[in-house]
Amino acid sequence: MMVHMEVSWLRVLLDNISSYLSLSSMDDLSSNPAHKYYTRGEDIGKLIKPVLENLIDSDAAPSELLNNGFEELAQYVDELREQFQSWQPLSTRIFYVLRIESLASKLRESSLEVFQLLKHCEQHLPADLISPSFEECIELVKLVARDEISYTIDQALKDQKKGVGPTSEVLVKIAESTGLRSNQEILVEGVVLTNMKEDAELTDNDTEAEYLDGLISLTTQMHEYLSDIKQAQLRCPVRVPSDFRCSLSLELMTDPVIVASGQTFERVFIQKWIDMGLMVCPKTRQALSHTTLTPNFIVRAFLASWCETNNVYPPDPLELIHSSEPFPLLVESVRASSSENGHSESLDAEELRQVFSRSASAPGIVSEVVCKTKRNNNAAADRSLTRSNTPWKFPEERHWRHPGIIPATVRETGSSSSIETEVKKLIDDLKSSSLDTQREATARIRILARNSTDNRIVIARCEAIPSLVSLLYSTDERIQADAVTCLLNLSINDNNKSLIAESGAIVPLIHVLKTGYLEEAKANSAATLFSLSVIEEYKTEIGEAGAIEPLVDLLGSGSLSGKKDAATALFNLSIHHENKTKVIEAGAVRYLVELMDPAFGMVEKAVVVLANLATVREGKIAIGEEGGIPVLVEVVELGSARGKENATAALLQLCTHSPKFCNNVIREGVIPPLVALTKSGTARGKEKAQNLLKYFKAHRQSNQRRG
């Protein structure tokens, strides 16, 4: 049943969904190997978001059971968002996709549970709470595809052990599903997996090492099969000797060079490989002791002679390097096979998207699509449920950094004692005089702190925080960035917030904010200051320490991620009255008005800060001078429900006791959208709109009396 109680997890879930949906503005999202899982999460998010908004606006609040459901779903949404934001091109794609797929599956099941709980409470809710009904929402979530590449990989590994596979069709499916669409990506994956396997062997983790060995074999077969396909495509009267073909380009070489491992590659391709920070031989997967490229005159001479004899003209490597090589393994036949078996995801996705876009106005459309696709999805669901369970856990993905790799396997699990032992060793490494040692230690702690609450507690208990704080002044850009991110991850734990602040982190964090080497470091410094400012006493301390001006600078000139983190921090700091004037004097209003352009995807963040600043005289003046009134009116008319609410609150503050602003706002045509808001806005939005309209009426009557 529904009772009146705090709805904190409901709001957290709504905020998390909004943050997740905002990922659609990321430039590199479409190239993410797990993009299709983002789309599935987006479909669920767009379905549940209006339900949550209406639930917040209603008089009913969730029961404890439902609040628990919101909490679980909020955590899955946030974890999924973090995974998409943390994607790095030079990390293992297979494990990344498997992790995303696992979270996407949990998200789907958790959202089903939430809708089922809401359905049980439906009689306690207003009749017009949502459209379509909860039953229809349940059916829509069930339509979200749940085919699993993890099942395909498990089967491929089993077939591999039996010596009967995998088939080319299976290789294609794995490659396409994990974003391994070029020979270079396949080779990178093999190198990353090999490094992870070596780390597993060092820790005597035989189960993990065996699993990784199977995946390495799969990537090797992908490379070999792609090589065979490429050989068949070469228009040569005779077969091209393998020694004349570059393992990276799969083409005839024109400028063969030797690397430190003794292997020969086409110069421009191996140079690109090294320039990416891959200090490992693509063929042998050995570490390269140096980057010198030695011309292989012998191979060049033999190659020239062979080409002349066989009348073959090698392609221009400079043209090849700028073109991407797709993975051409029978793609059409695989898609045709999937379609025959009822797994044509593109059709399901298209139909489902139509339902999501039309369901609010035409709920009857749901049953039509449900009936049409339920049988097909059941087949996929049945097969996915039969996949074998394995006790092995995903290792954390590996991130590559120039000039080498970080040789630390990241686990998601581990006993508290083993983690504590490792953390103590890492803390000693943080104090090392070797930058390489410090770099590896901060990178490892960063991952540990991100992975679990228990890890964050252990890291803080082992007194890692003071050492991390001191590294904020490091002259090594990677160490500094990872140290900041470690503190950000640790600050998720409320007790750690105080430990971080009491370790003197505020001033060093501001130092990074001002002078950080990487945009990532500046953005995460802003995010950490926001996290600390949740505690009331630190709002004043952060403001007095000089954080506001660099936060405003980041708001104006930082990356999009940095702008968002700066806006969030400024919002929290501006709640404290003494900080409002500092934010205004630092020039934040101009940037906030600029960021209300929908192209930035920051309208809601900018508006809520302006609403805070509009409560003081200096803020009102600045908003008026910087052209904030027209954009606030535009948000009232065209913004999201939350955006309209906060824009109206800001306009109400501007107009109160200011006939000049009142006239300006009216001239911008705000009255029609305000009237509409009184009928369809959030509860607070309706209240603010009604108050503003009343104020306009009183203002008009006052003018008439004076006239």
UniProtKB/Swiss-Prot annotation:
EC number from the UniProt entry: 2.3.2.27
Location of the U-box domain: 239-313
Pathway of action: Protein modification; protein ubiquitination
Catalysed conversion reaction: S-ubiquitinyl-[E2 ubiquitin-conjugating enzyme]-L-cysteine + [acceptor protein]-L-lysine = [E2 ubiquitin-conjugating enzyme]-L-cysteine + N(6)-ubiquitinyl-[acceptor protein]-L-lysine
InterPro entries on file: ARM-like, ARM-type_fold, Armadillo, RING-Ubox_PUB, Ubox_domain, Znf_RING/FYVE/PHD
Presence of keyword DNA repair: no
Pfam families linked: Arm, PUB2_N, U-box
Designated name of the protein: U-box domain-containing protein 2
